[in-house]
């Protein structure tokens, strides 16, 4: 999932900011490269605005300007904000399947876009509580439900952007903590419940918020 976010930002940055300087006759249609939709009107500006907002937030975070400290003061909150700005766009840019429209955003993708934005927004809003109250180990019931929802939306986003085989690999790998006691010796471990696994994926620094996302948010965006 973290590598997916890396791919998305590079696409948004170079697809939303730089094409204005590229001659039309030399630019390849995006759908021929990655199967994305040809957005028009309002939806065309959604990834562009998200890219600009992420750039400004990253500048504030990397240079410790504290101009928008309510987002960048807590590191995990900044990471959740990166996810919140990128993950929902998958449902706008990548169709559900090959038969779906490549020029219009259907109603179900609009709902998924809004739902994913709301799910990610929940973690942005509660990032400080997650740290202070140790939700990674004992989260309230409603946070457990939202953790399952984030888990599901990420696997579906991987399927759309990376294909079904990669989604299957990611999905099976994400279930590992549940069956850790059943795998061969070298990778065997103590099992976790599905609820603990969902919380682990959503709130720990070892899964969605792991090293790939941290390196991406701290280094890759700044470099670009």
What are these language model-derived features?
Residues 70-75, 100-105, 131-224:
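Hydrophobic transmembrane alpha-helices of multi-pass solute/ion transporters
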Residues 15-138, 144-148:
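Conserved, well-structured core domains of diverse proteins
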Residues 2-7, 54, 73, 84, ...:
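Short linear sequence motifs
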Residues 1-19:
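N-terminal amphipathic/basic-hydrophobic helices that include classical n-h-c signal peptides
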């Amino acid at each position: 999932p973290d590598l997916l976010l890396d791919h998305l930002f590079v696409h948004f940055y170079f697809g939303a900011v730089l094409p204005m300087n590229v001659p039309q006759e030399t630019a390849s249609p995006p759908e021929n490269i990655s199967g994305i939709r040809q957005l028009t009107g309002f939806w065309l500006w959604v990834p562009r605005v998200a890219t600009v907002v992420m750039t400004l937030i990253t500048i504030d975070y990397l240079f410790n300007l504290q101009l928008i400290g309510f987002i960048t003061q807590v590191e995990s909150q900044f990471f959740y904000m990166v996810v919140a700005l990128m993950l929902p766009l998958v449902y706008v840019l990548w169709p559900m399947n090959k038969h779906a429209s490549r020029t219009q955003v259907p109603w179900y993708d609009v709902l998924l876009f809004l739902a994913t934005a709301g799910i990610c927004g929940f973690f942005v809003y509660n990032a400080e509580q997650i740290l202070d109250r140790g939700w990674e180990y004992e989260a309230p019931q409603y946070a457990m439900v939202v953790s399952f929802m984030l888990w599901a939306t990420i696997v579906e986003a991987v399927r759309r952007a990376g294909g079904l085989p990669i989604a299957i690999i990611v999905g099976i790998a994400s279930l590992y903590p549940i069956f850790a006691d059943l795998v061969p010796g070298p990778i065997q471990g103590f099992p976790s419940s599905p609820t603990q696994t969902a919380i682990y994926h959503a709130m720990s620094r070892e899964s969605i918020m792991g090293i790939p996302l941290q390196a991406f948010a701290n280094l890759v965006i700044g470099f670009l």
